[in-house]
């Protein structure tokens, strides 16, 4: 079974296919040229058998949208949201006959797809151990990438061919304290340029109540596969009650690099503003109790052990807690005298003593309990 959907200008087409063994796949064409080769889709679960095949199509729907909405905050006031959509309804041929819907949207500046698990008998919660979304490339493209670090987005970008990507070489960075790169994967967005000059960017949108996505690099098969950021403490990636939808998996497509920046694909796929009136949002400068920890003047923790020298050897520990009530007031005075509207404070809450250099640091912060030398209410009162 096959089905297709094209963008409004018909320059981009998504083709859906169900292989003989019931594996859902998709491919993408731009101006009649392949951009994404047939790529499979599916899931692995902790509380259910994997859902990667044995499916049949029970129906399809098509939709179109052409609207203009006002961006509450950003670089462009009015944004056009124009796409064609294909919804494929799937169900297992055999028990437990689980149902899965896949939504495909074709825009003039790219494509997106997401999964939807409808309400169904016998399943109220799904515990996802991994998502098996593949992106099969058409060549050894030039790539701009960051390693798939589960903790941070603080690495520099690298430029290489796709087959030249090796994120594991970025492990144990001497200047990054909380870094975890479990395999050869990249954080999104990863941006590519094909031999013909076509520019691609792979990312996600509407990331709500779901694990973030990295992309495993498979140079032998010229393919990427989604790897959800996990938790050793929990032992799974996502736990959701039905019905629910995954984030959108996005591919922005442009003839040149500026077109990727001009693309509004991501914001069109994100949820509309839920806050209502945001006219009170105003830009501001702020100062922070933060950089002094990097300079070794003070520490994040009250115990006096956690500053930049905790994982570098060319500095002397400050051993003096930075986020104290007294220091915060000093920063507030400086900000007020210089017309600076905000103050950022790091290290005010308990848990920092078990952060840098600890493999079991997950969950050490409750983001509620202050250290005894930081009076949160007094700092707020003084700032007002």
Question: Model-predicted segments: where are they?
Answer:
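Short coil/turn connectors at secondary-structure junctions
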Residues: 246-247, 282-284
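Tryptophan-centered motif/residue detector
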Residues: 144, 202, 288-290, 300
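N-terminal accessory beta-strand-rich subdomains and adjacent acidic, glycine-rich linkers
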Residues: 4-276
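Catalytic cores of large soluble enzymes that bind and process phosphate-bearing ligands
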Residues: 80, 103, 242, 279, ...
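Substrate-binding cleft of carbohydrate-active enzyme catalytic domains
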Residues: 286-288, 296-384
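Carboxylate/His-rich catalytic cores and anion/metal-binding grooves
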Residues: 257-276, 280, 325, 329-332, ...
